[in-house]
């Protein structure tokens, strides 16, 4: 883009950018309100707003830069001033538009791209040009200017130079030699900028930031110097407290932000109307800094950022109205050129020649006027053509004058006065001198206020440093006290643990002695039990041998007795027993014999009783018959009695035989019973011996064996416990010695810690004093030491340590 001519009038360029709906708005199903009738217009609420260009939500960062800010680079390098600032409500995308993601070719904003393009243009310009580039970065936070490159500089004041151009006095100016250094300055400033979290934005800017790039170029041959300033402004967004939920400090920040933006809107409105003689630039520091950008000597580009959401419709309309008003503002731009002595001399000669010509023309006009007044008629050919001369003079003035000269010959604005007559040149000069004097006094007061503020800030910083040092010392003392208490508590705990361990060891030793005594006692009892067991075993063996011998002796008798029993059984026809005589054991055989004998005895008794009863009946009948016979009543009956008597006599041998057999049976029974009793007695003796040496002895033996097993187990457990305790005893003693050593070490460490803390405290105080002295010395040196300028010559490729970054930014801007 070719630079405009000096004194050219140009309007403020306004571009509109609509961001996409964010996640919250999409989640709330907000409607997308704006419509785009054309590339340079936007419709909202039935009203159409026209700007230089409208960027839709899908517009990339590169397209925004190419369309809105690319031409500013050439203007700045041609000696013009330039301004780019973004305006809009909070969370509308201003910081994203101005800064973006630095280092990302796709997401980087206007500032990194414009920085890269400035150096790319410099590298392609005439090699006889030498550039001096310096940057400043400051913010307006709560109506106070803070230096972002030096956070210690706060509440900086605004002054005016000899051309009545406002500037921030005392702001750090860092000379740079490449895009990397500029981006590093931006990163340093961003880390010091005020941001906060609100309901509408996680990284809400709480201040207006101004990044100023001053490019001064000098031609080595002609010594011609041009100076261009580029203001890159990121405004904080206007806020509604009901939406952002601001409280406390954030609320106060929002108030100051809205106040400065309101002052900016008033200035825009005053400039847009063009009828007001006074524009309130001094109402806010923001408008004071942007004074040249709004209605002054600057090519200004305004990017209004707006939200498309129905939720923010009112703020979006206000933003669009602001842009429409700003578009009507007209600036008068001039080249900031510093002339050499030869150029001033040439222009002086030219002005002198022009004045001579004008003087001759004025003299000719005066002669013509005198002739007319004298009544002489002057022919038309002799008339002096003042219009051509005036046009020539004006063209010469406009073509050869400098901005400084034009400012010097420009009429001063009328001063307010109480006189009703015309203001003379002397009064005008007087008023001008008074105004200059008042401005000088105002600047002096600003300087005094600035000095007092700086001194106050230094004192405040010193107080803060002292408080921090005191707080640190108190914290260190508290930490040391806590550590001391902790060490003491640990030492007491260790001592208590040592005492408990000694007590436990003593108890273990006592228990060990008791267990050893019990073990010895159990050993003795075990020996006694073993001896008793051995004697019982011997007695059992003897009883067993005696029993076997007795059984051997009784074997033939038992067999003889069995044979007798079998004979008796055969005689009495006990078939069931006879058939089982070979299979039944002795005791079963005896039982069966007892049953058989009892049965025979019962039959014998029954037969004896029946025969006795029959005999008694027969005797009774016989006596009765004898009585009847004696009485002679029945002879026949007598005969019968005789027959019966004869029968009785015949039966008597049988009865005798039965009686003899019964006697034999009784004798046999007695013998059998005797043998059986003897056998049973022998069995009872044997069983008695068995009972004496059997269940009771076995039960006692079992009891003793169980006790023996238990005692054996207890003995083994005691032996194992004793062995374990003997193994653990050296470990416990070692641990006890270790704990005692640890207690001693902790006590020593506690003493050393106290000594170190005291030494560190003294060292810290000395270090604080040294740092303060170094800061004092550095500040003293800064006051008198010059700045080192980094010249840049076109045609020489710039190399930096981070070449990738310097290469990536230009490519991203030219893509």
From Swiss-Prot:
Keywords assigned by UniProt, alphabetized: ATP-binding, Coiled coil, Cytoplasm, Cytoskeleton, Microtubule, Motor protein, Nucleotide-binding, Transport
* Any one cellular-component term (Gene Ontology): synapse
> How does inactivating the gene affect the organism?
Conditional knockout in PVD neuron results in a complete microtubule polarity reversal in the anterior dendrite. Conditional knockout in motor neuron reduces the number of mitochondria in the axon. RNAi-mediated knockdown results in reduced dendritic branch formation in PVD sensory neurons. RNAi-mediated knockdown results in an altered distribution of recycling and late endosomes. RNAi-mediated knockdown results in defects in nuclear migration in hyp7 hypodermal precursor cells.
Q: Where is the composition biased (Polar residues)?
A: 797-815
- Which BP terms from GO are recorded? anterograde axonal transport of mitochondrion; anterograde dendritic transport of neurotransmitter receptor complex; axon guidance; embryo development ending in birth or egg hatching; establishment of meiotic spindle localization; establishment of meiotic spindle orientation; establishment or maintenance of microtubule cytoskeleton polarity; locomotion
**Which domain of life does this protein belong to?**
Eukaryota
Record-linked InterPro entries: Kinesin-like_fam, Kinesin_motor_CS, Kinesin_motor_dom, Kinesin_motor_dom_sf, P-loop_NTPase
Which residues are ATP-binding? 88-95
Any one GO molecular-function label of the UniProt entry: ATP hydrolysis activity
Coiled coil feature spans: 335-374, 422-554, 695-785
Q: Provide the protein's localization.
A: Cytoplasm, Cytoskeleton; Cytoplasm
The ranges of region (Disordered) come to 788-815
Where does this chain mainly localize? Answer: cytoplasm
The UniProt function text for this chain reads: Microtubule-dependent motor protein required for organelle transport. Plays a role in endosome transport. Required for the transport of mitochondria along the axon of motor neurons. Involved in the nuclear migration of hyp7 hypodermal precursor cells. Required for the formation of dendritic branches of PVD sensory neurons. In non-ciliated neurons such as the PVD and PHC neurons, required for the organization of minus-end out microtubules in dendrites. Also required for the minus-end out orientation of microtubules in dendrites of AQR gas-sensing neurons.
Q: Which family does it belong to?
A: Belongs to the TRAFAC class myosin-kinesin ATPase superfamily. Kinesin family. Kinesin subfamily.
Name the UniProt record assigns to this protein: Kinesin heavy chain
């Amino acid at each position: 883009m070719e630079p405009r001519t000096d004194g050219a009038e140009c309007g403020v360029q306004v571009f509109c950018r609509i961001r996409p709906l964010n996640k919250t708005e999409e989640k709330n199903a907000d409607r997308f309100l704006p419509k785009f009738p054309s590339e340079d217009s936007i419709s909202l609420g039935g009203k159409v707003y026209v700007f230089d260009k409208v960027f839709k939500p899908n517009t990339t960062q590169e397209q925004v830069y190419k369309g809105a800010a690319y031409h500013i680079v050439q203007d700045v390098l041609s000696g013009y001033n330039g301004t780019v600032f973004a305006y809009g409500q909070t969370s509308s995308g201003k910081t994203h538009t101005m800064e973006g993601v630095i280092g990302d070719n796709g997401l980087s904003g206007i500032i990194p791209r414009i920085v890269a393009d400035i150096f790319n243009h410099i590298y392609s310009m005439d090699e006889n040009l030498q550039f001096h580039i310096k940057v400043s970065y400051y913010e307006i936070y709560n109506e106070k200017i803070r230096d972002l490159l030096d956070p210690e500089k706060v509440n900086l004041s605004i002054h005016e130079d000899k051309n009545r151009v406002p500037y921030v006095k005392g702001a750090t100016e860092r000379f740079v030699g490449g895009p990397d250094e500029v981006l590093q300055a931006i990163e340093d400033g961003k880390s010091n900028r005020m941001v906060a979290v609100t309901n509408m934005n996680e990284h809400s800017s709480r201040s207006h930031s101004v990044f100023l790039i001053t490019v001064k170029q000098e031609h080595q041959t002609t010594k011609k110097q041009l100076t261009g300033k580029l203001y890159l402004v990121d405004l904080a967004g206007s806020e509604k407290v009901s939406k952002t939920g601001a409280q406390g400090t954030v609320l106060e920040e929002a108030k100051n932000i809205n106040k400065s933006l309101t002052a900016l809107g008033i200035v825009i409105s005053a400039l847009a109307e063009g009828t007001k003689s006074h524009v309130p630039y001094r109402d806010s520091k923001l408008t004071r800094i942007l004074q040249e950008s709004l209605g002054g000597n600057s090519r200004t580009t305004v990017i209004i950022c707006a939200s498309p959401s129905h939720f923010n419709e009112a703020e979006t309309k206000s933003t669009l109205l602001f842009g429409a008003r700003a578009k009507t503002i007209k600036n008068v731009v001039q080249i900031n050129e510093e002339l050499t002595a030869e150029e001033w001399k040439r222009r002086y000669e030219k002005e002198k020649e022009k004045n001579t010509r004008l003087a001759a023309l004025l003299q000719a006009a005066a002669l013509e006027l005198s002739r007319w007044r004298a009544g002489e008629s002057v022919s038309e050919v002799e008339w002096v053509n003042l219009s051509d001369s005036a046009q020539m003079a004006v063209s010469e003035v406009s073509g050869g004058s400098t901005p400084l000269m034009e400012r010097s010959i420009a009429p001063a604005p009328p001063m307010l006065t109480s006189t009703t007559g015309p203001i003379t040149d002397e009064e005008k000069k007087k008023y001008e001198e008074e105004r200059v004097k008042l401005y000088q006094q105002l600047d002096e007061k600003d300087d005094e206020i600035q000095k007092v503020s700086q001194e106050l800030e230094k004192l405040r910083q010193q107080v803060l440093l002292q408080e921090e040092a005191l707080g640190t010392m108190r914290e260190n003392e508290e930490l040391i006290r806590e550590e001391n208490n902790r060490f003491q508590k640990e030492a007491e705990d260790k001592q208590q643990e040592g005492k408990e361990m000694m007590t436990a060891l003593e108890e273990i030793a006592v228990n060990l002695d008791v267990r050893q005594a019990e073990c010895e006692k159990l050993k003795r009892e075990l020996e006694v039990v073993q001896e008793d067991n051995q004697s019982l075993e011997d007695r059992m063996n003897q009883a067993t041998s005696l029993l076997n011998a007795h059984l051997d002796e009784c074997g033939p008798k038992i067999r003889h007795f069995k044979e007798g029993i079998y004979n008796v059984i055969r005689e009495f026809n006990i078939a069931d027993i006879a058939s089982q005589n070979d299979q039944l054991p002795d005791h079963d055989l005896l039982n069966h014999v007892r049953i058989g004998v009892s049965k025979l005895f019962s039959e014998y008794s029954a037969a004896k009783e029946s025969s006795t009863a029959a005999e008694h009946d027969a005797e009774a009948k016989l006596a009765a018959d004898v009585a009847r016979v004696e009485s002679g009543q029945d002879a026949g009956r007598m005969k019968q009695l005789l027959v019966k008597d004869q029968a009785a006599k015949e039966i008597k041998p049988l009865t005798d035989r039965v009686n003899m057999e019964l006697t034999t049976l009784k004798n046999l029974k007695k013998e059998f019973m005797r043998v059986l009793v003897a056998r049973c007695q022998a069995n009872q003796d044997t069983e008695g011996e068995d009972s004496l040496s059997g269940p009771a002895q076995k039960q006692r033996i079992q009891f003793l064996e169980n006790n023996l097993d238990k005692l054996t187990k207890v003995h083994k457990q005691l032996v194992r416990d004793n062995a374990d305790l003997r193994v653990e005893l050296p470990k416990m003693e070692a641990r006890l010695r270790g704990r005692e050593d640890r207690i001693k070490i902790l006590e020593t460490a506690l003493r050393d810690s106290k000594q170190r803390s005291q030494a560190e405290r003294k060292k810290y105080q000395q270090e604080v004093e040294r740092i303060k002295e170094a800061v004092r010395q550095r500040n003293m040196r800064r006051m008198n030491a010059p700045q080192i300028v980094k010249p840049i010559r076109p045609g020489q490729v710039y190399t930096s340590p981070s070449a990738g970054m310097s290469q990536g930014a230009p490519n991203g801007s030219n893509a």
